[in-house]
Amino acid sequence: MAPALLLIPAALASFILAFGTGVEFVRFTSLRPLLGRISESGSPDARQGWLAALQDQSILVPLVWDLGLLLLFVGQHSLMATETVKEWMSRYFGVLQRSLYVACTALALQLVMRYWEPVPRGPVLWETRTEPWATWVPLLCFVLHVISWLLIFSILLVFDYAELMGLKQVYYHVLGLGEPLALKSPRALRLFSHLRHPVCVELLTVLWVVPTLGTDRLLLALLLTLYLGLAHGLDQHDLRYLRAQLQRKLHLLSRPQDGEAE
């Protein structure tokens, strides 16, 4: 195991990479389709129909390329989450196992965003071009995206993202406190095993609620929706624990205000 002076910069570098990738993901999934849709979308006359698109190489080739990028991301994200790979990584990288997983996931997502091929001439599932819908629908989508991202960031109040990002493992190791998950209750471990992507509904809103749902966006939304659906397995016990944790943390946040009131 590397000394602490090397562990801390490695964990911080992984976190910074993941944070930057998250900012880029906001631009990729929200800002580009909402604010750049006029310049990037093709005219209705230039678009192919659904049947004609299946025979057009200029549409099929970029779609296959985009599908390959998504499968690369999903494959990396799933393979490195298996117990066999995690045990192997823990054996050779120790407490950096989670940080390495986060860094590899961020790099895979960067590949998807950097090399994604738009399909402006492809068919669209829906589109708003006539007034008043061309004004109000993009505005409504923008508001829903802002709310969704705020909810995603607010989940930091409930979930231990320092552990999910790999920072807490290194911090505890340096202080000699052991494994962070070993200190959590069985109910917390049960919840984390069922839900490692605690932003499912919000991400689905971001993926699907857009003014123009073109072919490549439809591919992105469908595949990530399927992946998110398979990655979740919450039950009533998890929901009760999650509700109790939210109430407890909100109570802790309100304590200073109560003290000032007294």
UniProtKB/Swiss-Prot annotation:
Kindly state which keywords UniProt assigns to this record, in alphabetical order.
Answer: Membrane, Nucleus, Transmembrane, Transmembrane helix
| Main localisation | nucleus
Listed under GO cellular component are:
nuclear envelope; nuclear inner membrane; nuclear membrane
Keyword Membrane assigned: yes
Q: Which residues lie on this side of the membrane: Nuclear?
A: 1-4, 81-97, 165-191, 235-262
Protein topology in the membrane: Multi-pass membrane protein
This protein's source sits in the domain of life called Eukaryota
Perinuclear space face: residue ranges? 29-58, 115-133, 211-216
Q: Which residues cross the membrane?
A: 5-28, 59-80, 98-114, 134-164, 192-210, 217-234
Compartments it resides in: Nucleus inner membrane
- What family does the database annotate? Belongs to the nurim family.
- Identify the PANTHER family for this entry: NURIM
What's the protein name? Nurim
Its gene is NRM
